[in-house]
Each structure stands twice: as structure tokens, then as C-alpha cells.
Design a protein with these regions (language model features):
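Catalytic alpha/beta core domains of metabolic enzymes, predominantly
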Residues: 128-129, 140-248
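Short, amphipathic alpha-helical "lid/cap" segments that border enzyme active or binding sites
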Residues: 25-32, 149, 282-289
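Short secondary-structure transition/capping segments
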Residues: 55-58, 91, 116-119, 147-149, ...
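Active-site beta->alpha loop and helix N-cap motifs at the rims of alpha/beta catalytic domains
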Residues: 2-11, 15-144
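Short helix-capping segments at alpha-helix termini
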Residues: 69-75, 98-100, 130-132, 157-160, ...
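A general structural signal for well-ordered alpha-helical segments in protein cores
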Residues: 28, 60, 64, 89, ...
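Structural motif
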Residues: 1, 35, 96, 153-156, ...
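C-terminal alpha-helical cap/extension of soluble enzyme domains
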Residues: 5-16, 38-40, 200-203, 207-296
Length: 296
């Protein structure tokens, strides 16, 4: 049995920016503190929601180092270090390990894609270069490649391939992963609207966008489930659905960064090519945050 890196809700945290587009580390620290104070079970730094694709190598490593130092072991810090360049993924994964990260989040190679055999070779090379637990991230809507359950079962044989963040949206596929991998691979939901379905298949929690704006609520969905109150967990999941949908009414992290600014955080601008959400998306976010109770 592989011990999970965390159990519950981990925030896929935004990267706040100054008006000039540089990283706002002071605000990042404030957000981390607030997340931990409101029940977040782990911090995921430099993931999709953190605009990792628009960060320079130096910024990427600096964000990881800052998150590790500022979090100070209060909760695990998971560093997004995936790349479609295996050599670069190894390099930045080693840097994350040296910085003191607790685990790595490794998205499947995108654009150049690859075969299932290539995915096995890619992840084997990274896992062999570090000692940290590796969380594989399957998000075919972004990468253009779907990591098959049988491929995950093969990768789960590697001692430090610890988990998968499953964001395919395909619950049947997640069930197949659970059946094939058993206790050799932990499963996290990569979609806030599928937390309870994945928990019901033995999942250990969620890597969450919702947690940015509602950390306590995302934590509570998972906590209720693990306390045995599955009816309460389902109730909380269903209550969150309209806001979850609003947060994905445009490409992530466009809506959530706007929402964080609206809630009073100095989240700052997006980096191009991402731009502000439409007026319709903004109004939807406004309405759903008020209905959910996170915006007065």
C-alpha cells in the first residue's frame, strides 16, 4: 500500500501577479496562509491554475522555493514539474526536490504527445531521477493524449509513482484505474464536479480549483466523506456544482483569477495569451459566488 501524499482537498493555487506582470510573492504568501487557515490539506504550486506554462524556468523554481519555505511544513507542498520535454521535466523535478517539495505533479506530455509506450518511458525516466512521490496528471482535454488505465497500472509498479490526478472526466476510466491498480496507486479527482464520484471509487481527495475561492468548503466535502457522512459529502458536492461550472465557463485559470480579484485578493492580471473573461462569465461568477456564500 502506498501512503497518499495528502488526503482531502489540495488547492491548485493561483500565481498572483503585480500590475507589471511579475510574480507577487507577498500576496502568494497571504493566500497560502489563508488557505491553510481554512482547511486546505495541501498546496499545489505551479500547476495549470498557477499559469505554469507562462512562467520562466527561473520563476517556476522561485515559486516552488517560496511555497516550500512559506508553508513551512504546515501542509504538503506539491510542485508542478511536468513538461513535454522529458529532460527538462527531470531537471526541474530535481530542482523541486532540492527545494524541499513533498511531491511532484507531472502532467502528460502535450503537443508532441506520444504513444502509451512513450508515456511509460517518460514517467519512468522522471521517477528514476528523483526520490519524491510522483503524482501523474491525466488531462487529455489539454494535452491531446489520454493515459490509459493499463498504462497507469504499469507505471504504478514504480515505487515512487504514488498517485494519479484524474481529470479526464471519464468516471468509467477512473473505475478501471481503481480496479487495475488497487492500493498501488492513489487517485485524486482533477475535477471539482467529480469529487464525490471519485471518492466513491476509493479516491483520496481532489486537487481543486474551487479551493482557491472556497477552501473550507472543498475541504469539508472530503472531510465529510472520510468521517463516514457520505450523505453530507454528497449534499456539499451538489451545492458546489453551480460555482464549479462557473469557474470553468472559460479556460482555467481565467475565471478563478478574476474571482480571486473580485474577492479582494491582489491576484493581478493574467499573462498572455490568457485574457480577462467576458462580461457574461464575470456576471455568472458574481452570481454564483453570492449564491454559494463566498461573496457578500
Amino acid at each position: 500500500m502506498k501512503q497518499p501524499v495528502f488526503t482531502g482537498a489540495a488547492v491548485a493555487i493561483i500565481t498572483p501577479m503585480h500590475a507589471d506582470g511579475t510574480v507577487n510573492f507577498e500576496e502568494l504568501g497571504r493566500i497560502i496562509d489563508d488557505q491553510i487557515a481554512h482547511g486546505t490539506d495541501a498546496i499545489v504550486i505551479c500547476g495549470t491554475t498557477g499559469e505554469s506554462a507562462a512562467l520562466s524556468h527561473e520563476e517556476h523554481v522561485e515559486c516552488i522555493r517560496f511555497a516550500v519555505k512559506h508553508t513551512a511544513k504546515r501542509v504538503p507542498v506539491i510542485a508542478g514539474t511536468g513538461s513535454n520535454d522529458t529532460a527538462f521535466a527531470i531537471e526541474i523535478s530535481k530542482e523541486a526536490e532540492e527545494a524541499g517539495a513533498d511531491a511532484l505533479l507531472l502532467v502528460t506530455p502535450y503537443y508532441n504527445k506520444t504513444s502509451q509506450a512513450g508515456l511509460i518511458a517518460h514517467y519512468t525516466a522522471i521517477a528514476s531521477a528523483v526520490t519524491l512521490p510522483c503524482i501523474i496528471y491525466n488531462v487529455p482535454s489539454r494535452t491531446g493524449v489520454n493515459l490509459q488505465p493499463a498504462t497507469l497500472a504499469e507505471l504504478a509498479k514504480l515505487p515512487n509513482v504514488n498517485a494519479v490526478k484524474e481529470a479526464s472526466g471519464n468516471i468509467s476510466q477512473v473505475a478501471d484505474v481503481a480496479a487495475l491498480c488497487g492500493e498501488e496507486l492513489n487517485i485524486y479527482s482533477g475535477n471539482d464536479d467529480q469529487i464525490v464520484p471519485i471518492l466513491s471509487l476509493g479516491g483520496k481527495g481532489v486537487i481543486s480549483v474551487l479551493s482557491n475561492v472556497a477552501p473550507q468548503q472543498a475541504h469539508d466535502i472530503c472531510a465529510a466523506w472520510f468521517s463516514g457522512d457520505t450523505a453530507k459529502s454528497l449534499e456539499l458536492q451538489l451545492k458546489a456544482l453551480p460555482l464549479c461550472h462557473a469557474l470553468f465557463a472559460d479556460v482555467n485559470p481565467i475565471p478563478v483569477k478574476w474571482a480571486m480579484n473580485r474577492l479582494g485578493w491582489n491576484a493581478g492580471p493574467l499573462r498572455l495569451p490568457l485574457v480577462e473573461p467576458s462580461a457574461a462569465v464575470q456576471q455568472s461568477l458574481e452570481n454564483e459566488m453570492k449564491a454559494y456564500g463566498v461573496l457578500k
